[in-house]
Amino acid sequence: MGRASLQPVLTGFALTTRVHIVGAGLSGLSCAVHLAESGHRVALYEAAGQAGGRCRSYFDAQLGATIDNGNHLLFSANHAALEYLRMIGAGDSLIGPARARFPFFDLRSGAHWIVEPGAGRIPWWILSKARRIPGTGIGDYLAGLRLAWAGPDARVGDCLNAGDPLWERFWEPLTVAALNTAPREASARLLWRVLRDSFGQGEAACRPLIARDGLASSLVDPALAYLEAQGAEIHFNHRLRGLGFSGDRAARLDFGGPDVDLEPGDMLVVALPPAGAVAALPGLEGPQDTRPIVNAHIKLPRPPLDTALKARLGLDATLPILGLTGGTAQWLFIRGTMVSLTVSA
């Protein structure tokens, strides 16, 4: 969703070029916002009846509440996402702690601890036994440097020892949360990039942030309002079935109804998930292996934790999130009387 990913798209665009963007998930919305800001005319098409893709909110009649379809969390190091929020006027819609801290609870043993990075790039905090995860030593953390020299095909499990205490209590939760892939299958290089850009920059870069009033209120609705104010065309219930070509140029968008003709000079951006892109674009190959994330939302008659227990577990008052080990779910999100559990990979 970042500006960097848009640079190849923006390169070579003539000012006021009309750009057709297929897909109104966050990639498509971000692309549309940046192009509209640059003065281009934007037409946005979405297969569903609402924007946001996998990042949206909806009203659940059984719970009697508006919930998010997933428990999405941003790191403060995600400058591209924060810039996107600023552009659409939602820069103040995220909440998070004043300092980065991640409380964990082990469901098997009842042990609990807090991962609290230091301020600088060098992790001096691992020298303090009181700040290390229970049962771990300095060498367990330094072993993570092996990820920096991992080959292109190396997996996290190739670089780190699954028998080390840090595996279950840090490496596995981090890998699953960041890559939605088990460590034995996840790319070591990709995990190193996550570490380098977050924990490797000090605590100010890895403060967790969530949408205060829901994903739609922060990431989707303000973007649609911004695009409408810029004169963008927004079309819902438009599923791209294929492209019509004139020579080697895309000339028509087939939506199974009235087609949309692309004029000479128009540009096309396909911002679809792999399955949708492969179905619409001839000759395109995409990944077939996917891993869903399951979220369970439970409404309780009263808040589940009292003030004393929150303090004991180290939960932040503004962002009560608890990492879980030793069970099926990896994360517990608490918002008043609403509890959400996340099961990844």
Annotated model-derived regions:
Residues 27, 50, 275:
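Conserved Rossmann-like nucleotide-cofactor binding loop
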Residues 2, 38, 238-345:
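Mid-domain catalytic core of redox enzymes
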Residues 17-44:
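N-terminal Rossmann-like FAD-binding beta1-loop-alpha1 element of flavoenzymes
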Residues 194-257:
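Helical element adjacent to the flavin cofactor pocket in flavoenzyme catalytic cores
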Residues 1-19, 37-38:
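Extreme N-terminal leader/targeting segments of oxidoreductases
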Residues 52-77, 137, 143-148, 197:
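Glycine-rich active-site loop/strand segments that organize a redox cofactor
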Residues 78-196, 205:
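Mobile amphipathic helical/loop "lid" adjacent to a hydrophobic cofactor/ligand pocket
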Residues 36-61:
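Glycine-rich FAD pyrophosphate-binding loop
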